[in-house]
Amino acid sequence: MSGWDSYRVVYGAELRAAAHEFEDHGWPVVERDATTLLLVTGTVLDILEVPASFGRQVCAHLRDAGEVVPVGAAPTGEWWFPMSMGSTLPAELRDTADVRLHTAGEMVLAPPSAVPDGWVHWRVAPALSSYHVPSADLLLHSAVDVARWRADHALRPGAQRPAGAMAVGMRS
């Protein structure tokens, strides 16, 4: 067996293990192909997708509030947050570039999917929150706080930030 073939066997096993882990915790997942898992939204969870810089600020805001929530990331710079289903995107977030709410049967790449630019991975693994999906209210409230701070800060460069709304340095 060549090195590439053995890698594909190991990766396939890792992908299947991840799919079983999602299923064991009630997260709806489908395997698109040999390198890609998709989380299905709208039955158990919805997903808020944001740019990485916005996601870092949301994570800092949640962390300052003592909340640990799962966070996925794509190599193209999107971060996404699973959350309880049934909400709509608040007006403050609809006006924010590149913020998207995935609902009603949409599918989102799930770790450890391979894409041309790299790997979809966890920034905060769901096991750290026992696969608990945070409430949409908690997550959307934090995202709105960050969006408001960013809008205010753009108008007033010396604006006081809400707790955790801006990460110092690069956090990964």
Residue ranges of model-derived segments:
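Helical (often loop-to-helix) elements that flank the catalytic cores of nucleotide-handling enzymes
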Residues: 83-107, 169-172
